[in-house]
Amino acid sequence: MPMYGDLGNKLVQHAKRTQNLSHLPPYQTELVRAVAREIRDLDKDVASLLEPFQGSFDPSAEQATACTLLVNHLSMRRNKRCLLAYHRIRTDKLEELVWNGADILDLAGQTTGGPKGVTEGNEGGGTTSSLSPQEEDYFRQFGDLLALYKGQWTDIDLTGSLEPPRDLFIDVRVLKDAGEIQTEYGAINLTKNSQFYVRQGDVERLIVQGYLQKLG
């Protein structure tokens, strides 16, 4: 039999797994709604228990009722903390992806479908965006804010790696088509599965974005 807080605990487990992933898994819409619905139901139960006392409730005289109220209150509080933790982890991941130069179209295009793609809170076939509408809006606005901040220092890449490259030139494999890019030594057409020996500074951003894989 499900207990209070079980759904919130599932959200925390999703958040914990998200911390160890390089991408953002699908937003658990139905699970979030279920936790919020449980909070509302508990709040209604609390109001119903207190209604007969008309503001004169004495916990010492009504210990059984006081115990029930305490359990309901702690359950609501825990559920709220689970919701906050889940959304905080996803927000941190979104901001990290913005700093790494991820594209909103790539994130929104991550889909789940079929038996292996079904996740709790997103049952059913078909395709589902990895981001909620609110997350897509936050991603865009944070990206705009970062672009405005970076615009003050046009000669410095504030999103670049803090570690200097060990090798000036590296071998890379193209993981997905990226089109033509201009480098210091000319244009390169990046087509899937092709390999190049290039200056690391020219392709570092594409490596971070997942278009290229560094070899060796």
Swiss-Prot record:
Looking up InterPro entries in the UniProt record yields: GINS_A, GINS_bundle-like_dom_sf, GINS_Psf1, PSF1_C
Instruction: Enumerate the subcellular locations listed in this protein's record, separating them with semicolons.
Output: Nucleus
Got a GO cellular component term for this one?
A: GINS complex
Q: Which UniProt keywords apply?
A: DNA replication, Nucleus
Q: List the residue ranges of the region (Disordered).
A: 110-133
Answer yes or no on keyword Amino-acid biosynthesis: no
Q: Name one GO biological process term.
A: DNA strand elongation involved in mitotic DNA replication
Which CDD domains does the record match to this protein? GINS_A_psf1, GINS_B_Psf1
* Biased composition range(s): Gly residues: 111-127
One matching Pfam family is PSF1_C
Coiled-coil positions: none
Q: Where is it chiefly localized?
A: nucleus
Function, please? The GINS complex plays an essential role in the initiation of DNA replication.
Q: Quaternary structure?
A: Component of the GINS complex which is a heterotetramer of div-26/sld5, drc-1/psf1, drc-2/psf2 and drc-3/psf3.
UniProt similarity note: Belongs to the GINS1/PSF1 family.
Q: What is this protein called?
A: DNA replication complex GINS protein psf1
Source organism per UniProt: Neurospora crassa (strain ATCC 24698 / 74-OR23-1A / CBS 708.71 / DSM 1257 / FGSC 987)
Lineage here is: Eukaryota, Fungi, Dikarya, Ascomycota, Pezizomycotina
Q: Which gene encodes it?
A: drc-1
